[in-house]
Swiss-Prot record:
PROSITE patterns referenced in this protein's UniProt entry, alphabetically: HTH_ASNC_2
InterPro entries: ArsR-like_HTH, AsnC-type_HTH_dom, HTH-Siroheme_Decarb, PF0864-like_C, Tscrpt_reg_AsnC-like, WH-like_DNA-bd_sf, WH_DNA-bd_sf
PANTHER family: HTH-TYPE TRANSCRIPTIONAL REGULATOR PTR2 (PTHR43413:SF7), TRANSCRIPTIONAL REGULATOR, ASNC FAMILY (PTHR43413)
SMART domains, per the entry: HTH_ASNC (SM00344)
Gene3D superfamilies on file: 3.30.70.920, Winged helix-like DNA-binding domain superfamily/Winged helix DNA-binding domain
Annotated HTH asnC-type domain residues: 6-78
Residue ranges of the annotated DNA-binding region, renumbered to this chain: 25-44
Identification of the protein by name: Uncharacterized HTH-type transcriptional regulator PF0864
Amino acid sequence: MSEIHLDDLDRNILRLLKKDARLTISELSEQLKKPESTIHFRIKKLQERGVIERYTIILGEQLKPKHLALIVLEVGKPVIEDFLERYISYISSTLSALPGVLFVAKSGEDKIIALVGKNNKDELVKFIEENITSIPNLKHIQIFPITEIKKGEDLTGFLAEV
């Protein structure tokens, strides 16, 4: 994939749309002091080049999970090492299907990172006990309750399910 070059106008359009994707071309034009045709053309080009993939929403506070935990799972190596990748894939897809699991990623060859969110602390603890700590063949589990988000507070509103 070739490197994407953005000029100041492209960056300003993206910055405004990231803040509020509901802005109309007319409103963008007014804020950026550029003709509507220019804004329309630039947005079309940004979409064609894959810079803008889609427009989405961020759920409000009422629908965001109130209690979050970042969980790091270290998977024990199976007797047949070739099965490690398949087992990690299986755990990842199983976790991804569970309600309240907002994010799942692989780290290194034997770790899985998951972000879990629930509406109350007891529900979160119960979920972790029933669904995470019960996974067989885990070498180590680290649970990091998130007490305060310093940057990226919209992330849970983006990832949360309805």
